[in-house]
């Protein structure tokens, strides 16, 4: 039986982190978690990490698409925070962001890790950005590292 399974060390991986500035007090913690994970677990050097800042979550897919089209990166981590309010705006922003990032991954055959918080309350977002529910930025980085390795293995075996 042949099992393809990624590990999380990716010393030579070139990673772009596309991050929204909206809700920056939360998103900066996600960025810290992602970078810490890339460096500590993935052994990725500072020189191989590029951070791209955009206004909000809606802009993440376009920036990710441009990064992917450059052909210079092994993967992309998207970070942001969308918190439900009193209007349907939340569903539109969260849904389009998710769909757009998934489309980039499929169109460019490149791992795009979804580290965008989509929560009902600010308290839930705070919990997921480095307090009692962990750091979803770090989790997105772990997922990306594993997928970079899985895709490299598939390329070698297929």
Curated annotation (Swiss-Prot):
Task: Identify the pathway.
Answer: Cofactor biosynthesis; riboflavin biosynthesis; riboflavin from 2-hydroxy-3-oxobutyl phosphate and 5-amino-6-(D-ribitylamino)uracil: step 1/2
- Keyword field: Riboflavin biosynthesis, Transferase
Which residues take part in binding (2S)-2-hydroxy-3-oxobutyl phosphate? 86-87, 128
Provide the function of this protein.
Answer: Catalyzes the formation of 6,7-dimethyl-8-ribityllumazine by condensation of 5-amino-6-(D-ribitylamino)uracil with 3,4-dihydroxy-2-butanone 4-phosphate. This is the penultimate step in the biosynthesis of riboflavin.
Q: What SUPFAM superfamilies does UniProt report for this protein, alphabetically?
A: Lumazine synthase
State a single Gene Ontology molecular function. 6,7-dimethyl-8-ribityllumazine synthase activity
Q: Catalytic residues per the record? A: 89
Q: What is this protein called?
A: 6,7-dimethyl-8-ribityllumazine synthase
**Family under the similarity heading:** Belongs to the DMRL synthase family.
Give the originating organism: Shewanella frigidimarina (strain NCIMB 400)
Q: Which reaction is catalysed here?
A: (2S)-2-hydroxy-3-oxobutyl phosphate + 5-amino-6-(D-ribitylamino)uracil = 6,7-dimethyl-8-(1-D-ribityl)lumazine + phosphate + 2 H2O + H(+)
What GO terms fall under cellular component here?
cytosol; riboflavin synthase complex
The protein's matches in InterPro entries, at most eight in alphabetical order, are given as: LS, LS/RS, LS/RS_sf
Q: Among the record's GO biological process terms, what is one?
A: riboflavin biosynthetic process
What EC number(s) would the UniProt record show? Answer: 2.5.1.78
Q: Which residues bind 5-amino-6-(D-ribitylamino)uracil?
A: 22, 57-59, 81-83, 114
Q: Does the keyword Methyltransferase apply?
A: no
The keyword Transferase appears for this protein: yes
**Gene of this entry:** ribH
Q: How does it assemble?
A: Forms an icosahedral capsid composed of 60 subunits, arranged as a dodecamer of pentamers.
